[in-house]
A protein has these predicted regions:
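Structural detector for internal amphipathic alpha-helices that build alpha-solenoid repeat scaffolds
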Residues: 6, 10, 17-26, 39-61, ...
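Short alpha-helical hairpin
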Residues: 28-33, 59-65
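Core helices of alpha-solenoid repeat scaffolds
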Residues: 65-66, 99, 134-135, 164, ...
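Short acidic alpha-helical/loop segments enriched in Asp/Glu that coordinate divalent cations
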Residues: 100-101, 117
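Alpha-helical repeat scaffolds
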Residues: 102-105, 137-139
Length: 224
């Protein structure tokens, strides 16, 4: 009940902020796109969404919304609109349409030098969707030195042999080291202990905890 109340309060505040932005011309072209998207969703799917906050707070259950929303995402000038739509509407486990679109859009953002702004939202989305057919593409993403930590951990859970050398290299990158340690633990491979165990004595608490957890996962497997 408390969570519902808090959500209702936040929703009301965000509606008021949206009304203010619309009245003062903030992100005016993007709100025109929002209105067009809401109208198309209503016309095609009978979805009664009347504001951007409806799209942010309420997930459309019908997967037929994905091709409609996909047409709009690349068109927003303020990328924040696109990322909110992805977070609320594209976290659909195993959905190939979501996965295929996000792959295309990621490559487009990368080509335009805008990927860093979308990285966190995309990282979470790929982990939620869990499309194993995209392993080669996902490995390409973690080849960037400090990018897509949750995707890297997911590749570890999948025990991706192709990703393993990249993950080991990431142990040298401070900003992503903890995720690399976590990912290695997911392989549950005794031969990886020499890469993990040195971090048990790290001066950084996050690295120590990740290493201890990873070693425990691997050693428990060995005992069994």
């Amino acid at each position: 009940m408390a969570d519902n109340y808090a959500t209702a309060v936040l929703y009301k505040a965000d509606i008021e902020r949206e009304l203010y932005n619309r009245a003062t011309g903030v992100d005016a072209e993007d709100y025109i796109l929002v209105d067009s998207l809401c109208a198309e969703l209503s016309r095609c799917l009978g979805v009664d969404y009347r504001s951007f906050q409806d799209l942010r707070y309420k997930t459309i259950k019908n997967d037929a919304c994905i091709p409609i929303i996909s047409k709009y995402i690349p068109r927003f000038a303020n990328i924040g609109f696109a990322l909110e739509l992805i977070t609320q509407q594209f976290w659909r486990k195993g959905n190939k349409e979501c996965s295929n679109f996000l792959e295309r859009w990621t490559l487009e953002l990368k080509a335009n030098g805008r990927l860093s702004k979308a990285e966190n939202a995309l990282d979470n989305a790929f982990v939620k969707i869990q499309d194993k057919s995209k392993q080669d593409f996902l490995i390409g993403l973690i080849c960037e030195k400090d990018a897509f930590p949750f995707t890297m951990e997911m590749l570890g859970r999948w025990k991706s042999e192709a990703a393993l050398p990249v993950i080991i290299e990431r142990l040298e990158v401070d900003t992503i080291k903890t995720s690399a340690i976590t990912a290695l633990g997911k392989y549950k491979d005794i031969s990886l202990l020499p890469y993990i165990e040195p971090f048990i004595n790290s001066t950084k608490a996050g690295e120590r905890k990740a290493a201890a957890r990873a070693v425990k996962q691997i050693k428990n497997l060995r005992i069994q």
